[in-house]
């Protein structure tokens, strides 16, 4: 299952502030050729800014360059994240799932 919008944005503070919504949703971090992490948050913008501040160094070590997102309410965003993770198999979601036993 593909993202609802194929548009990717550069992962930097200016781009996040300009494009990422403050609303609830799912987001994905990727490099040019691989998916690194797909998450969900009550604020897509806040979550992305936390990555840029180094809050999740195990994700940043893979050097994500772009982000994507979908605005969704809480229950839908959790289900959508699971679908996207299953489809894309992001590197850091596999590490998180295997080390914590949760998704």
What are these regions (language model features)?
Residues 1-46, 50, 70-86, 103:
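GIY-YIG nuclease catalytic motif and its immediate N-terminal context
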Residues 52-56:
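Short, glycine/polar-rich helix-capping loops at beta-to-alpha or helix-loop-helix junctions
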Residues 58-74:
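Basic nucleic-acid-binding interfaces
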Residues 89-91:
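Acidic, metal/cofactor-coordinating or nucleic-acid-engaging core segments within structured domains
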Residues 93-95:
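Eukaryotic N-terminal accessory cofactor-binding modules
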Residues 99:
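N-terminal cationic and glycine-rich segments that engage phosphates or anionic surfaces
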């Amino acid at each position: 299952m593909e993202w609802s919008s194929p548009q990717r944005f550069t992962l930097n503070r200016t781009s996040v502030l300009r494009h990422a919504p403050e609303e609830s949703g799912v987001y994905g971090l990727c490099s040019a050729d691989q998916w690194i992490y797909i998450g969900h948050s009550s604020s897509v913008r806040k979550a992305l800014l936390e990555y840029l501040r180094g809050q999740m160094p195990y994700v940043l070590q893979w050097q994500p360059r772009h982000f994507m997102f979908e605005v969704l309410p809480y229950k839908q965003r959790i289900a959508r994240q699971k679908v996207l993770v299953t489809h894309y198999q992001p590197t850091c979601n596999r590490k998180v799932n295997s080390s914590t036993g949760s998704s």
